[in-house]
Amino acid sequence: GPEPFDKKFNQNYIHFFFKKKTKNIKDFLIDQHFVSGIGNIYANEILFLSKINPLKKAKLLSKKNCKEIVSNTKKVLLDAINKGGSSIKDFKSISGVKGDFQKDFKVYQRDGLKCKRLKCIGIIKKKIISNRSSFVCNICQK
């Protein structure tokens, strides 16, 4: 699929691609045929910022949802790049430096903790979706 920063990756591309798809949105975000370069961690963060439940069927996304996914994909990836990536276990850059993006996780690895969104009283819950860990606010991700 297109790179997240490619002009082809836009709300119209997403909306058209998803029109009749019954797969959940999280599976599409980590599918390299749909868009390149989004892994599990970033998919969780993108969906949180977009207020979308990872189990939501792709064909049910509105154009507004699609626009938010595009915008938040770029936001999350730029933030991660600027912070050197995410060092969960032993990841280091080529120069041997650990990334700092994990310090800003909104949902990933926050099972049982309060949602970081202002005025939300939700609790982050871990779910296994397609054999991958997913983290979802039980209130603000619909």
Model-derived features: positions:
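Short, structured motif recognition centered on aromatic/hydrophobic residues
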Residues: 5-6, 38, 69, 107-110
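Phosphate/anion-contacting hairpin/loop surfaces
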Residues: 1-37, 42-52, 57
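C-terminal accessory segment of soluble enzyme catalytic cores
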Residues: 81-142
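Residue-level signal for secondary-structure boundary elements
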Residues: 26, 37, 78-85
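Basic, amphipathic alpha-helical segments enriched in Lys/Arg and hydrophobic/aromatic residues
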Residues: 65-82
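Hydrophobic/aromatic-lined pockets within catalytic cores
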Residues: 47, 51, 78-81, 141
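Catalytic cores of DNA base-excision repair glycosylases
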Residues: 34-36, 57-65, 76
